[in-house]
Amino acid sequence: FAVPPAISAALARRLEHPIFGYEWPSAKLHGVVVDWLARRYGWQVKAEDIMFLPGLVSGTNLVMRAFGHAGDEALCWTPSYPPFLGAPANNGMQLKTVTLAESAKGHEARYDLDFDAFERAFTGRSRVYIHCHPHNPTGREYTRDEMARLGELCLKNNVVILSDEIHCDLMLDGRPHLPMAMVSPEIAQNTVTLMAPSKTFNVPGLGCAFAVVQNPVLRKRMHNAEMGIVPHVNVLGQVACEAAFSECDAWLDDLLVY
């Protein structure tokens, strides 16, 4: 679908400026993201917690690089978005999967968490848990109690949580989205949350996403791991992100009704 008019207008204005060199995300853009998270989800984060990225697939691989080594393990529910399944191997890690328990609820499929199987999947080499919320491809939204239990297991086993929440803006029927990092302060300190305007506003080709990393120790490891590997965020992507998160609330609300 077409992007919101405010995004098109912002891009047109930027194109009138003839210089397209490297550009660091501005303090204003950081503030716009912070305000968006507070406004839409009641999530209070600081500008310094935001790390901009060219995309969430690169962000997923960056997390593996930052927190795992060859032979270490990453956990993931299946079925799953294919890049999640490939990211551990890209970084010399092993993938351990736990299958969602499928059942029928009326005319719809239901996917439940097998906590016993999940807990058994942890070993001394477990380093990252890949949490997709809402889940791709099932569309499943995790409850607070489920995330608390998952988060506590990760804390117990010293496993970093990678929470990909790229579809969170598209919850239907007025259902609220609760970020994994809002479940508890302890879980927040153990979570890297990946988000982007790309799915919500149809701008994935502009290459602008971000990680929310509230623990400065984890954030430093992310910064160290990205050096020389992760490219700059696209200049036009930054413009689109700023417009999307500062001028398009009403457009998104109408989209969700539609």
Question: Which role does the model predict for each range below?
Answer:
Residues 101-175:
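Active-site phosphate-binding strand-loop segment of PLP-dependent enzymes
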Residues 44-50, 70-73, 125, 188-191:
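Short acidic capping loops at alpha-helix termini that bridge into adjacent secondary structure
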Residues 90-96:
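A short helix-loop-beta submotif of the ANL/AMP-binding
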Residues 76, 97, 130, 161-163, ...:
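Hydrophobic residues in well-ordered beta-strands that form the structural core
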Residues 1-55, 62, 244-247:
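N-terminal small-domain helix-loop-helix segment of the aminotransferase-like
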Residues 9, 184-257:
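Conserved core segment of the aminotransferase class I/II
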Residues 91, 156-157, 187:
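Helix C-cap/helix->beta junction micro-motif
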Residues 66-88:
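Conserved PLP-anchoring active-site segment centered on the Schiff-base-forming lysine
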